[in-house]
Curated annotation (Swiss-Prot):
<dbReference type="InterPro" id="IPR005535">
    <property type="entry name" value="Cyclotide"/>
</dbReference>
<feature type="disulfide bond">
    <location>
        <begin position="5"/>
        <end position="19"/>
    </location>
</feature>
<keyword id="KW-0611">Plant defense</keyword>
<keyword id="KW-0960">Knottin</keyword>
<feature type="disulfide bond">
    <location>
        <begin position="9"/>
        <end position="21"/>
    </location>
</feature>
<feature type="disulfide bond">
    <location>
        <begin position="14"/>
        <end position="26"/>
    </location>
</feature>
<dbReference type="InterPro" id="IPR012324">
    <property type="entry name" value="Cyclotide_moebius_CS"/>
</dbReference>
<dbReference type="InterPro" id="IPR036146">
    <property type="entry name" value="Cyclotide_sf"/>
</dbReference>
<dbReference type="GO" id="GO:0006952">
    <property type="term" value="P:defense response"/>
</dbReference>
<keyword id="KW-1015">Disulfide bond</keyword>
<comment type="function">
    <text>Probably participates in a plant defense mechanism.</text>
</comment>
<protein>
    <recommendedName>
        <fullName>Cycloviolacin-O22</fullName>
    </recommendedName>
</protein>
<comment type="similarity">
    <text>Belongs to the cyclotide family. Moebius subfamily.</text>
</comment>
<dbReference type="Pfam" id="PF03784">
    <property type="entry name" value="Cyclotide"/>
</dbReference>
<feature type="cross-link" description="Cyclopeptide (Gly-Asn)">
    <location>
        <begin position="1"/>
        <end position="29"/>
    </location>
</feature>
């Protein structure tokens, strides 16, 4: 889906549901 979640994951985790960490940003399908 949207490639960018508007969240960063420099610490390695994403808080947004459905998002995964593709350092240093969160992405989703």
């Amino acid at each position: 889906g949207l490639p960018i979640c508007g969240e960063t994951c420099v610490g390695g985790t994403c808080n947004t549901p459905g998002c995964t960490c593709s350092w240093p940003v969160c992405t989703r399908n």
